[in-house]
A protein has these predicted regions:
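Carbohydrate-active enzymes and regulators
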Residues: 184
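Long, charged low-complexity segments
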Residues: 174-181
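Amphipathic alpha-helical interface segments
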Residues: 1-171, 191-241
Length: 241
């Protein structure tokens, strides 16, 4: 309600000022309802879109696990490196995909925020150097006779993914314990850090990760095909015979 005195002053203003005031008031009142409606629409749309991606990821994950188990008893070391790299990546992408819809559209603000934090944590902790250091990857390329063109494609994919990784580290540099592990002794600071997490910045990081992920998904199967050719398998086998 507008106090009577303020209402009188408002009505004394020029008509454009009055119109603007009522427009702002209407936006403030309707905004929560508009946002809620948009989230419902977005949730339905994303759930439909992500269903196909989720099924594809699950299938790829199951196949990769099955093949890697077979390879672990073989002497094809380069193929092991590439399949292990694939599994490492697929697990991270599956985690992000599992919370993506909730991060963007869950009706509960806290659950949206929690999903955002999980996405950031996955990208923050995701470190390709752990599973495939540059020297190990280079050796695998050489042993499997991977073409220079495919090596460059992989390098570009890694560059984009590492860029997202760096951004995630920046966003969580001073707030990781509060936003994820709840280790900060200052509970109010912890609460403010969690609730003030920038959703748009988080989604930009995720978008950057997916940009690299798309390149990676295109390049890695081609690398694995080359590594699985007769010529490559014979070369790998002879190195460890």
């Amino acid at each position: 309600m507008v106090p009577r005195k303020q209402k009188r002053k408002l009505l004394e203003q020029p008509q454009p000022v009055i119109n603007r005031w009522f427009a702002i008031k209407a936006i403030r009142i309707s905004r929560p309802y508009v946002e809620s409606t948009l989230r419902v629409y977005l949730r339905a749309k994303l759930t439909y879109q992500e269903r196909k991606r989720s099924a594809a990821l699950t299938s790829a994950l199951d196949t990769t696990i099955k093949e890697l188990k077979k390879l672990n008893a073989s002497k094809f070391e380069s193929l092991k490196v590439f399949f292990n790299l694939s599994l490492f990546f697929l697990i991270a992408e599956k985690d992000i995909q599992a919370v993506k819809v909730d991060a963007l559209s869950h009706p509960d603000a806290w659950k949206r925020n929690l999903s955002l934090r999980i996405m950031l944590l996955v990208i923050h902790e995701w470190d390709m150097a752990k599973v495939a250091p540059a020297n190990k990857l280079r050796e695998a390329y050489e042993a499997a006779s991977i073409s220079q063109e495919l090596r460059e494609e992989m390098t570009e994919a890694f560059r984009k993914i590492n860029k997202a990784h760096s951004k995630a580290k920046q966003l969580l540099a001073h707030a990781r314990h509060a936003t994820i592990a709840h280790r900060d002794a200052d509970a109010m600071l912890q609460y403010e850090t969690i609730t003030n997490l920038d959703a748009m910045e988080t989604m930009k990081v995720a978008a950057s990760f997916y940009e690299g992920a798309d390149l990676f998904i295109q390049a890695l199967p081609k690398v694995m095909l080359e590594a699985g050719s007769i010529h490559s398998l014979l070369k790998q086998y002879s190195r460890h015979a």
